[in-house]
Amino acid sequence: IKITSVPDRWTILRPFFTKYITVFGINIFATKETPDHKIIHAANVLAQYLDNDANRLADNKEVLEELVNNNASLIMSKDENQMESLWDDFPDAVHDLFDNSLGVQDLYGSETAPSDGFDASLEEVLHLITHNGYSKVYPDVFGEQYDSEIADYMDIARGGRFAQVPSRYPSSAWYSYDDRTCDYSCMVTEYFYWALTTLLDAQNDGDRCDDISHEWKLCTPEQLEETDTGIYSLFNDKTYSLPVSYTHLTLPTN
């Protein structure tokens, strides 16, 4: 994995991003101020989500093809402030590109493999893959809408079907995301992340269980298997070639 300059195909983005990596044909654009080792770490996470057995071939070719066809792209900045400035500075042509031609997910260098705290690249990179890939290839299974298989499991996890965040979740719920800007489809995206990273044992570290309990109450694979039986079975269905190991995702960052 090597950082290069932004290719000619994406000249319109050069005023904003100076660094570029492609992973299995998926773009990572980064600002000049984003540290190289953060970019490479994000690229490694992306590579290992897609190629979890590390045989240099994508585990799910259909999902990869969809991601490439959608021009799935991770855009990275030094931190949140820089990302907000970028969105303000983008001309209409860039916003149109993102809206119509690129499947974009942003990620901050400051939240990527931090010295203390959770590695947000595990979340944001997975959102890129599930939203632009799995939900499109398998709409009846992973679609981010009512009545897909994953949405039905999410409704169980939330204690009911809620189009918007309820004023109070049922006490039986183990998924209780409370961001009121997150609509139903967004809730599915977040649920996919919480459940899969729990299966990978990525949430079971130090005080993490307490830190996330207001949104997600399962933090070990065993708890997921015992409580969220439907999603546990779905994620272990080899039809979909989802990642099964977190060890491949903790690669050196420099």
What are the roles of these predicted feature ranges?
Residues 21-22, 66-69, 184-188:
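Extracellular/periplasmic catalytic domains that process cell-envelope and extracellular macromolecules
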Residues 25-26, 35-162:
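Acidic/His-rich structured neighborhood in mature extracellular/periplasmic domains
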Residues 215-229:
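Membrane-interface transmembrane-helix boundary segments in multi-pass integral membrane proteins
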Residues 134-190, 196-205:
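Post-HExxH zinc-binding segment in Zn-dependent metallohydrolases
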Residues 247-253:
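Conserved small/polar residues in nucleotide/adenosyl-binding loops
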Residues 26-27, 199:
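A short, solvent-exposed beta-edge/loop patch
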Residues 207-217:
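Surface-exposed intrinsically disordered loops and tails
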Residues 1-16:
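N-terminal low-complexity, Pro/Thr/Ser-rich intrinsically disordered segments
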